[in-house]
């Protein structure tokens, strides 16, 4: 959901479309920035989620110095918070040089966390609680700890279990891995392994082409670690072929269709956006990247969670009297190819309008940061 240069966009969980009328304060995106996305235990293995977020916000404030004293709230999404210390958003705010007086909130809505942070920022501005808000998302899947449960009666600890799996990648209701929700979708909508591998191949090809043409340069903040500068998404695989994808074993179900190649990857990264009321931007003659026109949020059966964009997009189209043809580009998070294929099919989205620079399968999916990353790329 962001309108840029009179074009319309939809994203995975929240959607923003243009509509006319109304006296509600419009909200604009002044600036947006992200780190490169690192592989699991890759280039950002030794960098915490808080540090990644701080790196982005410091750069945003440096690029927009007049806004440093105007920020009135900080809202960041972060899923794997264990071990990060109290309120990562507050740490990011103070580490970035913002005033102690500015409140900060950390949001956990799993993969929707980064988008929810932006939605809450918009609400705060529209309610008159703030004129400028810093929002974003952070995640270090590499640094997510293992936890043991202590039994006082036996004075013993349980076998350590990864927080990443427990809190980030397992359905709390069924106790099953997120990958099995994709298998559910594939079975329910008859999505084949060949279809999923083909979708994954196209994602890799689009991301590789976008990277080669420099499409990500303006949105990526180069990050220096131990005198090495990282400025590209680490997980893009331009050498991917359909044949290679076909050799991969299924991960979650013996006779299933979901593999490591047609699912999103484990990643580290951060993204941030500076939002302001349109009247504030115009009063101070601040250029802006986009106008947020509308947001909606939906719930869905968690056993098929990945197809929620269908409901969200249909809801917004109906509410704003628009059709699919009226939308120029769609950005839908690629948690799993199976889910993305169903969304595209059910909404009849043309290939040339969908995730034109790749998505979670190719770029990576640092869960708490992905929502903001999508907005930043748009």
PLM feature segments, named:
Residues 159-194:
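A glycine/threonine-rich phosphate-anchoring loop and its flanking beta-alpha core
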Residues 6, 16-56, 113, 117-155, ...:
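Conserved beta-strand-centric core segments of catalytic alpha/beta enzyme folds
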Residues 34-35, 46-55, 63, 195-283, ...:
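N-terminal extracellular/periplasmic Venus flytrap/periplasmic-binding protein-like
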Residues 49-65, 88-92, 117-120, 178-185, ...:
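Short, well-ordered amphipathic alpha-helical segments that serve as non-catalytic structural scaffolds
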């Amino acid at each position: 959901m962001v309108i840029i240069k009179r074009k319309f966009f939809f994203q995975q969980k929240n959607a923003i479309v243009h509509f006319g009328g109304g006296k509600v304060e419009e909200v604009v995106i002044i600036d947006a920035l992200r780190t490169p996305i690192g592989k699991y235990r890759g280039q950002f293995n030794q960098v915490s989620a808080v540090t990644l977020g701080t790196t982005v916000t410091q750069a945003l404030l440096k690029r927009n110095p007049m806004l440093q004293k105007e920020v009135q709230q900080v809202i960041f999404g972060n899923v794997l918070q264990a071990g990060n210390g109290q309120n990562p958003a507050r740490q990011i705010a103070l580490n970035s040089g913002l005033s102690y007086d500015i409140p900060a909130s950390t949001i956990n809505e799993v993969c929707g966390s980064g988008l929810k942070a932006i939605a809450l920022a918009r609400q705060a501005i529209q309610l008159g609680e703030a004129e400028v808000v810093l929002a974003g998302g952070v995640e270090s899947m590499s640094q997510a700890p293992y936890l043991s449960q202590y039994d006082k009666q036996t004075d013993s600890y349980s076998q350590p279990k990864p927080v990443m799996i427990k809190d980030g990648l397992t359905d709390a209701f069924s106790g099953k891995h997120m990958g099995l929700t994709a298998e559910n979708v594939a079975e329910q909508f008859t999505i084949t392994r060949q279809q999923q591998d083909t979708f994954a191949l196209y994602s890799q090809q689009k991301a590789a082409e976008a990277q080669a043409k420099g499409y990500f340069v303006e949105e990526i903040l180069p990050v220096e670690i131990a005198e090495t500068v990282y400025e590209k998404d680490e997980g893009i695989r331009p050498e991917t072929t359909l044949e290679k994808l076909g050799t991969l074993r299924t991960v979650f179900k013996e006779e299933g269709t979901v593999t490591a190649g047609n699912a999103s990857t484990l990643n580290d990264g951060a993204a941030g956006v500076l939002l302001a009321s349109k009247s504030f931007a115009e009063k101070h003659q601040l250029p802006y990247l986009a106008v947020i026109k509308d947001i909606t949020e939906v719930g869905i059966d968690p056993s098929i969670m990945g197809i929620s964009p269908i409901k969200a997009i249909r809801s917004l189209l109906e509410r704003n009297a628009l059709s699919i043809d009226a939308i120029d580009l769609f950005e839908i998070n690629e948690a799993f190819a199976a889910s993305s294929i169903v969304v595209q099919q059910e909404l009849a989205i043309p290939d040339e309008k969908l995730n034109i620079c790749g998505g979670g399968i190719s770029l990576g999916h640092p869960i708490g940061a992905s929502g903001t990353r999508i907005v930043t790329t748009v």
